Amino acid sequence: MTLSSGPVTDTALPLRPAAVVMELERLGSFSPTRLSFARRLTRLMYQSRWHITCVGFDLDDAGYGSVIYRLDTAAKRYHVVVFSRHISDEQRTDRVIADTWDLTFGLVEGEVDDALMASLEENMPLQEAGRQHPRLLVLSRANRSVRNFDAFVAALAAGEQPDVSYLLEAGYLYRTTAVYGNGKFGIADYDRLRTGADFYQPFSPQMTAVYVLREFSVAQVEHIARHNNPALAVTLDPDL
């Protein structure tokens, strides 16, 4: 036991100036806390025992097509719909003026029937240029890290694990270029979420969609690797 050598004082430390705290280099070095968006979301997922299941996997040998994930929470059912398409290297840009992407995806409230799927397939790849459905809670798009993606597929197809150094340089297979919510481009308003049990926390629907995107990215590289070399292909080590 450690005994205090003197009285405990309740002296508040002065707040640092905003100009210091908000420096980009300083912000980039902050470690996640219990209040971080991702940690709050994954804690809710665990405590409420959310279940995410792939219920539709329609990709060709090169990994293009559509995939549907079902999300069951304690309160409701949602789906994340992903569309993967081929684009040239010249079309791949993270600039806001881009009009085509490797992936477009969204988080949908409720079931996805044939009519809704047809509407999403027609409009979601267009993003802001499309007529988006009001049951969409999140609308997003992403581009590949071509270097990482190709390296991961090649390694898995050869029966090996990718070199971790690739992730040290760019720690992703896909990077989102925009993640829209709260009524943007005609999707559901925040009023649909704020009184519910699932997505009342800030940015939680957006983080959920991106969480499923990460799961899709792994499933896609494994799928392509299996088609490239069925005899040797392995799955990605979860530690990566």
What are these regions (language model features)?
Residues 27, 52-55, 217:
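Short secondary-structure boundary micro-motifs
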